[in-house]
Amino acid sequence: MMRARFPLLLLGVVFLASVSVSFGIAYWEKQNPSHNKCLRSCNSEKDSYRNQACHARCNLLKVEEEEECEEGQIPRPRPQHPERERQQHGEKEEDEGEQPRPFPFPRPRQPHQEEEHEQKEEHEWHRKEEKHGGKGSEEEQDEREHPRPHQPHQKEEEKHEWQHKQEKHQGKESEEEEEDQDEDEEQDKESQESEGSESQREPRRHKNKNPFHFNSKRFQTLFKNQYGHVRVLQRFNKRSQQLQNLRDYRILEFNSKPNTLLLPHHADADYLIVILNGTAILTLVNNDDRDSYNLQSGDALRVPAGTTYYVVNPDNDENLRMITLAIPVNKPGRFESFFLSSTQAQQSYLQGFSKNILEASYDTKFEEINKVLFGREEGQQQGEERLQESVIVEISKKQIRELSKHAKSSSRKTISSEDKPFNLRSRDPIYSNKLGKLFEITPEKNPQLRDLDVFLSVVDMNEGALFLPHFNSKAIVVLVINEGEANIELVGIKEQQQRQQQEEQPLEVRKYRAELSEQDIFVIPAGYPVVVNATSDLNFFAFGINAENNQRNFLAGSKDNVISQIPSQVQELAFPGSAKDIENLIKSQSESYFVDAQPQQKEEGNKGRKGPLSSILRAFY
């Protein structure tokens, strides 16, 4: 009986086993879809070697998936195969049966390793995140444990940013940009230190650089030797976006020792030259003539773009110092100097022409031209020429006497010449008292200045004098400190508050302070109230740009005071004090333009000064 049933029992066991195996295989295939798909793809391989290699890859994939399940890790998007990555940029899709080579799963990394590894992985991750891009950001710890691929829109942003940087870089001179950045950092540090004890009490986040102050370190040397130097100031718009309207203007400084010559040259820029110290013989060379002028401190002259000129310092003892406002004509804010002669510092621009062009132009053999103009004789190697060291050279007293014979002095009787030098002190000062004087020539009075739309000023102040608070209606003023020291305060509107005007936030003013000394430059934007306090005997020059119809408006003093011209009815609405209080306050200052910075304190005067003007004037105290 048992023997008869045994085959049936055995058959049932086999049946149950086969069913279990089938269910197990089905379950395993469900849990291991990648391995199953990989095996099916191997069946299409007819070559035995490739078939075995394919099964080996599938087994490796199986082991990795089992390890992941054992470790309890959440499956991550697998790195993209290089071919698939190219498909994302529009290439033809590959056959589904062709499987990518498995990549090892990324292990958790320390935070300092993430940044280094990020660049290696950013082009290898699969684009699965694109399908789930709406999810919020994870915590930092999760990001460190489970690195995620960059989102596509981030890649696009990075790509556009990189392209933008490349285009920007191609349009700039990298050396000058790096120098500007270094100088900005240095100037930031200096301006923060100059704030003094008052600024040290402010929170650090409120300490910002003074974008209007350019100290002598902001100059870049173009030529220099033992006889002098030529320097150019950093571009205004590179210092601050607030100075964008000065992007077409540059400041040049020339300094030379006695008995020296600045070699003949021209520039692709209009020059407005002012003699700060010393004397000069400046000669303009034209096609059929030349004009030589004896210049001294306070003299000014326009040198049109493309005009060849040279400068001699004829004095035996005093250095010559000139300041120049340059207005480039080819490229905004950029200009070049073209020297006729070759020196060790630069080549003659004539050397840029071809040999046959020079021979035809001078109807002379090139060897003779090379010897006469460029100092190179036949057989000499480069570097053996008889050349001057730089563009500033020594000149003998005999040569100076010969050059002085035909030089004319600048006119002190007229300031309206179209092409001759003029002196800033040739007329009476427009503001003057025992504490200071201001001389000024405007475009309306001089054709040379009218063409450039610039006014010129020179100011002399005694130690302890205060140039009263005022603002210019249109002109942007560039101060050049020639001698002495001063403290300057400039008032503007805080940029942060400007951005909040639409939100009806109250406007706040910001005070820009600077300690100025010799060779410093300070820019005063139009409409910004400013005050200058001379801490020693002071002399400075000023270029007023966009000067036509400019008006200087004073905020204190007995004359030309804007506040005193406001009707009493409006004054009472504008200020907390009564019209009578405001009138008494204005009249308490008997001087105008230049006053004593430390007047004798009067008890009654102090009471009157403490409350009435809750306005922009408070920024000066």
UniProtKB/Swiss-Prot annotation:
Molecular function in Gene Ontology: nutrient reservoir activity
Chief localization: other
Species, as recorded: Glycine max
Classification via InterPro entries: Cupin_1, RmlC-like_jellyroll, RmlC_Cupin_sf, Seed_Storage-Functional
GO CC aspect terms: aleurone grain; endoplasmic reticulum; protein storage vacuole
Signal peptide: 1-24
Composition skew (Basic and acidic residues), residue ranges: 80-92, 111-173
Region described as Necessary for sorting to protein storage vacuole: 612-621
UniProt-annotated stretches for the region Disordered: 64-214
Acidic residues composition bias: residue spans: 174-196
Protein name, UniProt field: Beta-conglycinin alpha' subunit
The Cupin type-1 domain, residue ranges: 212-370, 422-583
Gene encoding the protein: CG-1
Localisation: Vacuole, Aleurone grain; Endoplasmic reticulum; Protein storage vacuole
Further comment found in the protein's record: A tridecapeptide (MITLAIPVNKPGR), called soymetide and derived from a trypsin digest of CG-1, stimulates phagocytosis of human neutrophils. The N-terminal methionine residue is essential for its activity, and the N-terminal soymetide-4 (MITL) is the minimal structure required for phagocytosis stimulation. Although not formylated at their N-termini, soymetides have a weak affinity for the N-formyl-methionyl-leucyl-phenylalanine (fMLP) receptor.
Primary role: Seed storage protein. Accumulates during seed development and is hydrolyzed after germination to provide a carbon and nitrogen source for the developing seedling.
Species lineage: Eukaryota, Viridiplantae, Streptophyta, Embryophyta, Tracheophyta
List of glycosylated residues: N277, N533
Entry coiled-coil feature ranges: none
Domain of life: Eukaryota
